[in-house]
């Protein structure tokens, strides 16, 4: 289902006596006497964080999670980040989750953060990575992945509710292996912003908490005390900051009850399974396998990749100039949301990598309005792009020719932050880690579980991840996954004096890349149902014909230097298949009653194979979607709070096809 895209309304700031004042909430962001000292006293000391951090285990898999209800100027985050690096164990990781319905525009944020030069190091990095302010979840990483920020833009209750598995407090705590360790309840005062202090929000906070979870807030309101108490927290008395008489500290004790109206059957998640060791086997050495290996290795896991070819990045990930661009839409659906979230995260990842490796270029790309349908689709974005020019700009024929460097027959949509990446080289970089072992020439035909670990070709690990593209449903356990093969052939042609002027990728019915090593990559065929990568001359001619339609005024070489074909794997809904793998027969039995009511509450998690996960079917957008999907999956395996909302976890879940079949019938 889709609905119109509703943009974020940014904060309306009025500067009074050089202090930021919210016109939406008729309240000040911070007082002249407050600022850093108030944040330190209320939130850091109120949650006893420094003492707790100093007692943490010293390993990469350990994550301390702080959640905040109002991001505001980001000061709390920056101060916490600075103190974490000073007092926490070197290898421990901080996950900071925050939310804002009306985030600050970047210029306002910069002005606010100039007030605290002692946080300038952290502030500079936050500003550099500050996201495009689109609704939903934004995941940012800092300090070599030691600090992560999940910034949720939207209504605080809706955003945090999406972090729940099911919304039933008893089952939620049975399923949950990851909890918030400390809460910063920071928002405009209860009298000015009641939604930030609602009973429903505190019920969600309780479901994301465990017995050691603490809460701190500057407020001493009886409304807040009552709401926290009703949610299962024990209130502790503490003097307020400065002249303020009181503030609230609390710790979570026990669950009481939750509304039956907001429960969701957790068909997408399994009951926790013990992992005796942090070891993982990954079948498949393409982009998906290499990204998930990298994400787990950064968390301290020992990873082994089994690849049937002679090196990584050979199959569908062998494109040396893979194009990165989003699928923009004025409508919000699981597909368009996942594509946008993924593009923004991937762009951040690749920008960081390009600082150290010559992997490609992110100088933009041009999606040509090559027919009336595409032109209409692009024109429908005009108001959306006025709000988010960082994502795309509509250009006419003259502008498109200037941007691309060559004469073009039409305008289009310029995506300024996109470009191309060398996928095989990226794979090599991702697995360059002492915790990652690669075994090549290793074809996997069966997988086995010995009641403790997974065993594949004589190699044993506690976790198994199937990232082998179109072959992912070759096993007995996975044969219910509806994966289709799509063959694509790229053609390499000699560059000419005229064609070398092309500066950015051009995409239309096909696509062409800027010259690299005196040649252009042109593509690509799209043969659904073809699972063999044999090369053929006809596809080269079709690619050249597409090229001529893209830029008919350019004298393109007809000299084919090389060609390459790969097999993409895709699902029926063109979203990837990522997450725990369900047992098909048991799933159908447990959830059979969904047939009569698809929204029926069933108090059972999905029956999944223990510690078996799928990470496949990324289609032709793997470069865009794989980084976020694998980072989420690594977090799930490592028992971390999700960086994706529940609705998107369900949208990419391997169980979605079984559920759909139950509801719709054979």
Curated annotation (Swiss-Prot):
Q: Does the keyword DNA-binding apply?
A: no
tRNA (mnm(5)s(2)U34)-methyltransferase: annotated span: 1-253
Q: Known catalysed reaction(s)? A: 5-aminomethyl-2-thiouridine(34) in tRNA + S-adenosyl-L-methionine = 5-methylaminomethyl-2-thiouridine(34) in tRNA + S-adenosyl-L-homocysteine + H(+)
Catalytic activity, EC: 2.1.1.61, 1.5.-.-
Pfam families documented for this protein: DAO (PF01266), Methyltransf_30 (PF05430)
Q: Which SUPFAM superfamilies match?
A: FAD-linked reductases, C-terminal domain, FAD/NAD(P)-binding domain
Described function: Catalyzes the last two steps in the biosynthesis of 5-methylaminomethyl-2-thiouridine (mnm(5)s(2)U) at the wobble position (U34) in tRNA. Catalyzes the FAD-dependent demodification of cmnm(5)s(2)U34 to nm(5)s(2)U34, followed by the transfer of a methyl group from S-adenosyl-L-methionine to nm(5)s(2)U34, to form mnm(5)s(2)U34.
Which protein are we looking at? Answer: tRNA 5-methylaminomethyl-2-thiouridine biosynthesis bifunctional protein MnmC
* Organism in which the protein naturally occurs: Legionella pneumophila subsp. pneumophila (strain Philadelphia 1 / ATCC 33152 / DSM 7513)
